[in-house]
Every structure is written in structure tokens, then in C-alpha cells.
């Protein structure tokens, strides 16, 4: 999304006149172009490389193929499209001082830009709802949101995003009627996004503000529930140690079950924090732009063009942040290391008790590797020996149903590898 009213001059250009034939100014301009080209190339490479890594990791390792990570894949796809089809052309528009790709691609490129932002925030909104269901209804979660249902939800997100982005632009509902805008629409070398006031406000509300409000509200509820659950765990542990101290001394299995449940809940809450960071980063990167986007159509000369384009690029840079945030997850870190050949590609035991073999599939192994022992505090087991029912509580402070695998181990199904 390029700034409204841009007259195809150097955006983000250094201060000072650009008088023709002035050697000093010309050298400054050339240095600025080279510097910006390098910076923008780094941004594009970071976006593409990071999100390809995320998509490949989830596709290759079955351990990462959870419902939540299906949504993470959708988010990574939106960021990848941004890095491949939006940011490079935006960089060219800035550096070349004109649009070199024709009117059709100008509108198509702008539509893709709006599509990626809309799909991203709607996916984040869905992730917030997913985590809310998972933490408030852990026993119903697997039936309420299966992987097939997740695929349908993702498809609906992209269909809705496509309609709200492509339809108004391709139908020219966005177009302004003043002379400068009409002249730009007619020129093959002008791709400035002149919009009417109604479109700017309506598109910002539908594509950003409404999903943002829903996301913030739902996630605030998630953290409230999570806080209450941690308090229940603390109380359950207190009652357990007070009433069953002698039994624990004789048989440590009950204590192990309670500790394992607490570990699982702490892992879930760490996953919530990671997702919260992702949502918070997205909001911080895009909210300033959408505020300016509305202000600009109300008071055209209030916001300098340089500020507008800087905030637009701050939103673009967000697409490179998410892969870095995913590194908070031990599962993602291990997957990234193996994909980058920083770990052996032979069978690897994950901290959750699963191993990755040479063909990329994951199998369960009961053995603990050296890595697993060293990371026990950080990467808690999700598949453990079945504890005694009398001492095993779930994240809500109640006794959960147990799923026993072929080796007699308890596999909690509500996992979140993030």
C-alpha cells in the first residue's frame, strides 16, 4: 500500500534539494539508493527465508502438525506472499521513482498487499479463538476443532480476505475523483494508491480494526482463564502435599503425575505467551499505519509522505519477525536446526519423547537422549508414564481422562508445540 498522493518522487529520500548536475547531491542520492537497496534486499531475504523455514518445518515434522500450527502455517504463507509479491515491487517503486509494471499489475499488487494483511490478522484472530477453546474446554477441544475443520477455517479466512481485498480494488470502488488521482489512474508509470474517504475508512475497519478488537478481547479472556488455572494448580499442589505426604514418600508415582501435569500447564502457558508476542508484534507494526491511513484521508496534508511510507514498511518488516518469535519453542528450534544441518539428520529424540528419522517422519521412542535430559526443564514431556489418578490434575485442577498408547504411556492430546 503506497501513500496517497505520492507524486512519484523519491520516498524516504535524504533531505536537501536534488538539483540536476549538482555533484554532491547526486552522490548523496546514489549512496542513498545503494543503501536503501541493500536494506530492502535484506528485508526481503529475511521474510522469504524465515517463512519458508517455518512452512517446511511444519510440513516435514509430524510433531509440529497440530491444529494451532496449521494456523501458523497460514500466517507464514501470508508473510511469504508478502515477501515474494509485495515488498520487492514496493522497493522498486521507491528506488526507481516510478512504477514500471503497468496499470494491471499495479492494482493486482495493491490487492495482494491488502490480502496479506487481512489474512494475517484474521488468522491471528482464529488462533486466539483456538487457544481460548483449548484452555477453557480441554476435553472437548479435539472434537470441536479437528485438523479437517482447521483446514476449512483457513480456507474461509483466505476467501473472506480475498473478497475484501480484491473485489473493491478490481471493481474500482476505491477510486478518488479529484484530478491528481484521475491522472495517476491513467498513467502506466503511476501506482499511487489514491482512495476515496469511504473506502479508506471502511477497508481499515473491516480488514484491521474489527479483527484486532476481536483478537484483543478473546486473548485477554484467554490470559484471565490461564491465570485462574495456575492458581488452581498451586492450590491443588498445596492440598496434595498436605494430605498425601506420607503416601508420596512411599510411592512417588502420584507426585510425578502432579508434577507432570503442572509441567504440561506451564508449557501451555509458555505457548500462550509466544502467541501473545506474535499478536502484540503484529499490532505494534501495523496499528500506526492504519491510524495514519484514516487520518490521511480526513486531513490530507497532516501526515508527511515520508512518515506514511515508513509506517507502511514497518508493517512489511513484521513479516520477518514471526520466524524469530517461533524460536522460543524448543520444538521449532530443533526442527530449524535440523533443516539447516546444524543437527544430525539421523534419528533425533525430541524433548517430548518423539524422534525424527531420516525421511522426516516422527516416531515415538521411550529412550531419553542427552539433549532431552539437558532440556527437561524447558521442553516438558507431553507423553509420560501413566500416573496414579489420585494425584493427577489437569490445567483446570481436575482429573483428566487418560489416553494410553501402545507402550502404556499417558499421552495428553491437548498439545501445543509452540
From Swiss-Prot:
Glycosylated sites: 6, 15
Membrane topology term: Multi-pass membrane protein
Source domain of life: Eukaryota
Protein's name in the database: Beta-2 adrenergic receptor
4-hydroxyproline sites (modified residues): 387, 400
Keywords tagged on the record: Cell membrane, Disulfide bond, Endosome, G-protein coupled receptor, Glycoprotein, Golgi apparatus, Hydroxylation, Lipoprotein, Membrane, Palmitate, Phosphoprotein, Receptor, Transducer, Transmembrane, Transmembrane helix, Ubl conjugation
Organism the protein comes from: Rattus norvegicus
Statement: the UniProt record of this protein carries the keyword NAD: no
Chain ranges passing through the membrane: 35-58, 72-95, 107-129, 151-174, 197-220, 275-298, 306-329
CDD domains reported for this sequence: 7tmA_Beta2_AR
Function: Beta-adrenergic receptors mediate the catecholamine-induced activation of adenylate cyclase through the action of G proteins. The beta-2-adrenergic receptor binds epinephrine with an approximately 30-fold greater affinity than it does norepinephrine.
Compartments reported by the entry: Cell membrane; Early endosome; Golgi apparatus
Main location, first listed in the record: membrane
Amino acid at each position: 500500500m503506497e501513500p496517497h498522493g505520492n507524486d512519484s518522487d523519491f520516498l524516504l529520500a535524504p533531505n536537501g534539494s536534488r538539483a540536476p548536475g549538482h555533484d554532491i547531491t547526486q552522490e548523496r542520492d546514489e549512496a542513498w539508493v545503494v543503501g536503501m537497496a541493500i536494506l530492502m534486499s535484506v528485508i526481503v531475504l529475511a521474510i522469504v527465508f524465515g517463512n519458508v523455514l517455518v512452512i517446511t518445518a511444519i510440513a516435514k515434522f509430524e510433531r509440529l502438525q497440530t491444529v494451532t500450527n496449521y494456523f501458523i502455517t497460514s500466517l507464514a504463507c501470508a508473510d511469504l506472499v508478502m515477501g515474494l509479491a509485495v515488498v520487492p515491487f514496493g522497493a522498486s517503486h521507491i528506488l526507481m521513482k516510478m512504477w514500471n509494471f503497468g496499470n494491471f499489475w499495479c492494482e493486482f499488487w495493491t490487492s495482494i498487499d491488502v490480502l496479506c494483511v487481512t489474512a494475517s490478522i484474521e488468522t491471528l484472530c482464529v488462533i486466539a479463538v483456538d487457544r481460548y477453546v483449548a484452555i477453557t474446554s480441554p476435553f472437548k477441544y479435539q472434537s470441536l476443532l479437528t485438523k479437517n475443520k482447521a483446514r476449512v477455517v483457513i480456507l474461509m479466512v483466505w476467501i473472506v480476505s480475498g473478497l475484501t481485498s480484491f473485489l473493491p480494488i478490481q471493481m474500482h470502488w476505491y477510486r478518488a475523483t479529484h484530478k491528481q488521482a484521475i491522472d495517476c489512474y491513467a498513467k502506466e508509470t503511476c501506482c499511487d494508491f489514491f482512495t476515496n474517504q469511504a473506502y479508506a475508512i471502511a477497508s481499515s475497519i473491516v480488514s484491521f480494526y474489527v479483527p484486532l478488537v476481536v483478537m484483543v478481547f478473546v486473548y485477554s479472556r484467554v490470559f484471565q482463564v490461564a491465570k485462574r488455572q495456575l492458581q488452581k494448580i498451586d492450590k491443588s499442589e498445596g492440598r496434595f502435599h498436605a494430605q498425601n505426604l506420607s503416601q508420596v514418600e512411599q510411592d512417588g508415582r502420584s507426585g510425578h503425575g502432579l508434577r507432570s501435569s503442572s509441567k504440561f500447564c506451564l508449557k501451555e502457558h509458555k505457548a500462550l505467551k509466544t502467541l501473545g508476542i506474535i499478536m502484540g508484534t503484529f499490532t505494534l507494526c501495523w496499528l500506526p499505519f492504519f491510524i495514519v491511513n484514516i487520518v490521511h484521508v480526513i486531513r490530507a496534508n497532516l501526515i508527511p509522505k515520508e512518515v506514511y511510507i515508513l509506517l507502511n514498511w514497518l508493517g512489511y518488516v513484521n513479516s520477518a519477525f514471526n520466524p524469530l518469535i517461533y524460536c522460543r519453542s524448543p520444538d521449532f528450534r530443533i526442527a530449524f536446526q535440523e533443516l539447516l544441518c546444524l543437527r544430525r539428520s539421523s534419528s533425533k529424540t525430541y524433548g517430548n519423547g518423539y524422534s525424527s528419522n531420516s525421511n522426516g517422519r516422527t516416531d515415538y521412542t521411550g529412550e531419553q537422549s542427552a539433549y532431552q535430559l539437558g532440556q527437561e526443564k524447558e521442553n516438558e514431556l507431553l507423553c509420560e508414564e501413566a500416573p496414579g489418578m489420585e494425584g493427577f490434575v489437569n490445567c483446570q485442577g481436575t482429573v483428566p481422562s487418560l489416553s494410553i498408547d501402545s507402550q502404556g504411556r499417558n499421552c495428553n492430546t491437548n498439545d501445543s508445540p509452540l
